[in-house]
Amino acid sequence: KIIVGKTESPNFRISDTIYNSTADYLLYYMRQQRCGYNPYLKDSCHTHDGFTVYSEDAPGNDSTQTSELIINNLYLIVAKGGWHDASDYLQYATTSETAAYHLLFAYKKNPKAFGDWFDRNGDPGANGIPDVLDEARWGLEWLDRMYPGGEEMYQQIADDRDHQMFRLPTEDSVNYGKGLYRPVYRVTGKPQGLMKYKNRSTGVASIAGKFASTMALGSELLQKTDPEFA
């Protein structure tokens, strides 16, 4: 510490490794934003995502869909996981693609800046894989679920009906009229949804392009640690 007269600074450390783990600090935020399983709460949330929402003239409508399970006249897709967006519980492919890409790109540019203190689920304990790659993989797994294949691609989970109250994700009680299922919106180039809850997405190429570039970078960087997934 530094002492000047009667004034003392807090204790601080002088070391060649003082900045170790600084790059990993951002991952604390990413882990607490996780959907499906939250390592901070040690509990799961939104495990029933979700039922598909799309217009009748969208590519891959009822007559061509092959990936969903139909229960009680609902077209269901397994879309759990990923990250909650901002301070609500909506999820977007385009922002998740960007987040995952930047995690991967940061590791590619400076892999020695990242450490390994957490496992793939975000729980404490090293697993032999840099935490930044674990976090990126969490996002990549969700993005993979959002693109079952062909012309069938999804870009959003939930909508502004989410904005009712502050609550923990494990205590989310917002009802979209389908029990525990939340709506999953298709990429169509047109806004999807109901009345004032209709989303504003008109992108197709931008979402697909970000998806392709993120997946390509993920495949490149995960070849060593997870070749089967890559």
Regions found by a protein language model. Give the residues of each.
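Aromatic- and histidine-enriched alpha-helix N-cap/loop-to-helix transition segments
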Residues: 56, 62, 71, 90-101, ...
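Acidic, glycine-anchored loop motifs typical of Ca2+
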Residues: 121-132
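Asp/Glu-centered strand-loop micro-motifs enriched in Gly/Pro and often flanked by an aromatic residue
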Residues: 1-2, 69-92
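Extended ligand-binding clefts on enzyme/binding-domain cores
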Residues: 26, 33-47, 53, 131, ...
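Active-site lining segments of carbohydrate-active enzymes
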Residues: 82, 86, 154-230
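Aromatic- and Gly/Pro-rich amphipathic surface segment
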Residues: 45-79
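Well-ordered alpha-helical scaffold segments within catalytic/enzyme domains
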Residues: 4, 89, 100-122, 139-149, ...
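Extended acidic/polar, glycine-enriched regions
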Residues: 1-28
